[in-house]
Amino acid sequence: MPTPRLWSWNLSPFAGKVRVAFAEKNVAIELVEIDPRQRPKRLRELNPTNRVPVLELDDRTAVRESTAICEWLEDTHPGTPLWPADPDARATARGLLRWVDDELTTNFFLSMRKEAFGLEDEDHPELVTILRSRLQQRWSTAEQLLSRTDGPWLIAGEAPTLADLAAAPLAVRLPAWKPDLVPDAEAFPQVDAWLSALRERPSSAEVDRRGAPAADR
């Protein structure tokens, strides 16, 4: 099988989730970096929605959307599993992944208007206030979820699942981009330990990895 080609954008937390998952399994990828302001024609050919991440397997096959790509990775490279072996725990982890993607990652990324898109917070101050409030509320929910396990992961066990790894881009970038939104360690000790554990994993280096520019292809 040729090396899969991952079409990515460095700042996309969903592309970052995929890069981290490949690193956890030690599976090589060819990384192609797009500029979201000048998306190459090839990207739309691979994904009619014109979004990343997209995993290009060959001239005719592409896997779209971050979770679908990670499921393909799990099916084709079962070593270092991304999901628990137990069916009940696996179903729970899949539900938690959806929550992390929809409630944590999305609110975090939309709060990063200036850092990700060069947009000033002053343009829509009410939107920024709402997004920040939502993120703070999500820390409370995350604390409750994490308190059900022995820590530091969302599912009891020694290794993280994809539900945890999906939060790696947030764990890495939040202290650098928006330190005022970092959860208070005293108020949310479980969340603090969770984010710290994600930052300490070698795979977290993939969050800042950039590929070869798509324009150079």
PLM feature spans:
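Long hydrophobic alpha-helical segments typical of transmembrane helices together
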Residues: A185, P189-R217
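GST-like domain detector, emphasizing the conserved glutathione-binding G-site
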Residues: M1-T129, R148-D150, L154
